[in-house]
Amino acid sequence: FERSAGIREIGAGVQISPNAGRLLHSLGLGAAYSEISVNPHRVVLRRWEDDSIIRATDLDESFISQHQVPLANVARNELVEIIGNAVAARTNVTLKFSTHVVAVEPGESSSVVLFSDGSSQTFDIVIGADGIHSVVRPCVGGIDKPRFSGSAAYRALVPRSAVEDLPVDVTNRMGPDR
């Protein structure tokens, strides 16, 4: 169930850990996923004041051998398109758009999902991937309201052609108290 009217391009870049990369490969999406991903050579944490390195992790052949797939960066819209196309190709999956889940009533052997139009459906399992204002989270003990942590992250996507000569590193600059 998706609240929006269709698959939308929201967000910028997504960093895919080896665990998630292995999952994409196991779902048969490895070739398409590999085409859109950029594999950084290392992850570097730097001090914001002087750009000195706090820590660097090489993502070399040893890392890939240990984890079976590399760490990868992808454009979110391209990843969503690959997954959306794979789901749409399945005959045993139905995507329902413009469907607003307002509550979930957990039960012993099934749960009832309530929708904004007053309808409901019963399921053996409910998986919530419904974001920061989750309707599903309170059903599994996540009762804390979201709050600002005081931290912010900024990302940008730059055309590959504009940065081809730069090292492919993930760099984090750590500011005060972080």
Question: Whereabouts are the PLM-identified features?
Answer:
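Short hydrophobic core segments
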Residues: 1, 79, 101, 121-132
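Glycine-rich FAD pyrophosphate-binding loop
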Residues: 1-12
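Active-site-adjacent segment of FAD-dependent monooxygenases/related oxidoreductases
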Residues: 12-88
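Acidic/polar residues in short coil/turn loops that connect beta-strands
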Residues: 50, 107, 117, 130, ...
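Central beta-strand plus flanking loop segment that forms part of the substrate or channel wall
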Residues: 76-78, 85, 133-175
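Short, conserved active-site loop motifs that form the nucleotide-linked donor/cofactor pocket
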Residues: 93-94
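A conserved short coil-to-beta-strand element within the FAD-binding core of flavoproteins
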Residues: 97-111
